[in-house]
């Protein structure tokens, strides 16, 4: 019978702790963990309670020395901000782990659990877990302090246009919303003939001025006012003002050009219709279909005014129409529009249907008009116009009527309109009873001009039910298709607030 000899087991001998005499495995300090912790505190010098400052107005935390950052509760950004407060005192230890401990949100306390390591006596590495409490104290930041002191803006952009309506500003509002240029403003105030944008920095105001110059024909002027001056550091505090003046010509305006400007544009007629305003003014001659563009610099060298306002347009009915084909322009003429059709029409005012008086004129809307259609136009024959260039024209070259656009039933168009636009939060100087009508006309312009609405965001209005074509008479009014609309999404619908937790039943 043979016996299997077990392999010898390797075992390390224990030693006694030099302080309390408890048997322990050998270590460089020759001490147990309990005695080692009583002798050495590796968290010594690290404060257990720290103060951080929080601005209640803008909900930002102070990051020394002078910057303010926005951090959500228990976020990585807030953890990094708290650890930076302890960075100087933790230079001799090694950070292993850090995490938040739950506290009541209204307790103004933030607790962080830290795990650190440090080499102690004779090369022994000791690890310790402890908690640091951060007390949140309120302190108003400089930006909010300026707001409360009513001295918060450093630059203002004053946009003005000398017109009787606000359709240009409605269009600018949509462009600003699309490009999110309103986010840097500290205040937006709507006043008569314009709107003011207030900024905390001059750079943001200059960015708005550059945007306006690329969007609409305008001219700007900058000025600044000295607020304070420090003679010791030789620093100056200025408030800057940018005055932006938009040309007083809008879509569907009838204008009379100067003879010199009309000649430089290809010998086109002096009486023209403005069909669109982008970064330049788009004009068309209703007698020849000749088109031209006038930029801002050209306009201010050769200014001209609108001969009529939207309220002065009268409604006419088409009595007869004759399309003019093979219209040839003279030598040196400019471009001719391919999107319009020249026609001769006989029209009669709807307010004078009991009489037999009719007007004869040419129009650029021959591709849209039929006998019996209603159009809006300007009556030159019975209007009292005081214009420098029109008074010097040969009366035989002044048309009796200039037709602008087709007329549709406004109530039917409003019922079919299942889309909406967003608006900026702004202060209004005084309520204008005519604002609603002007805004409705702006919506109609968007429906009629596809090029105009390509630059803005149109949202589907979920509160309106689409009207079936069979339920109402189709008068051929232009409409915006569903493919051009965006869904009006809001992040606060699902969370109950920006940055909040998802709501569940």
Curated annotation (Swiss-Prot):
<dbReference type="Pfam" id="PF21192">
    <property type="entry name" value="NMD3_OB"/>
</dbReference>
<feature type="region of interest" description="Disordered">
    <location>
        <begin position="467"/>
        <end position="505"/>
    </location>
</feature>
<dbReference type="GO" id="GO:0015031">
    <property type="term" value="P:protein transport"/>
</dbReference>
<dbReference type="Pfam" id="PF04981">
    <property type="entry name" value="NMD3"/>
</dbReference>
<dbReference type="InterPro" id="IPR039768">
    <property type="entry name" value="Nmd3"/>
</dbReference>
<comment type="function">
    <text>Acts as an adapter for the XPO1/CRM1-mediated export of the 60S ribosomal subunit.</text>
</comment>
<dbReference type="Pfam" id="PF21193">
    <property type="entry name" value="NMD_SH3"/>
</dbReference>
<dbReference type="GO" id="GO:0000055">
    <property type="term" value="P:ribosomal large subunit export from nucleus"/>
</dbReference>
<dbReference type="GO" id="GO:0005737">
    <property type="term" value="C:cytoplasm"/>
</dbReference>
<keyword id="KW-0813">Transport</keyword>
<dbReference type="InterPro" id="IPR007064">
    <property type="entry name" value="Nmd3_N"/>
</dbReference>
<dbReference type="InterPro" id="IPR048899">
    <property type="entry name" value="NMD_SH3"/>
</dbReference>
<comment type="similarity">
    <text>Belongs to the NMD3 family.</text>
</comment>
<protein>
    <recommendedName>
        <fullName>60S ribosomal export protein NMD3</fullName>
    </recommendedName>
</protein>
<comment type="subunit">
    <text>Associates with pre-60S ribosomal particles.</text>
</comment>
<keyword id="KW-0963">Cytoplasm</keyword>
<dbReference type="GO" id="GO:0005634">
    <property type="term" value="C:nucleus"/>
</dbReference>
<keyword id="KW-0653">Protein transport</keyword>
<keyword id="KW-0539">Nucleus</keyword>
<dbReference type="InterPro" id="IPR048898">
    <property type="entry name" value="NMD3_OB"/>
</dbReference>
<dbReference type="GO" id="GO:0043023">
    <property type="term" value="F:ribosomal large subunit binding"/>
</dbReference>
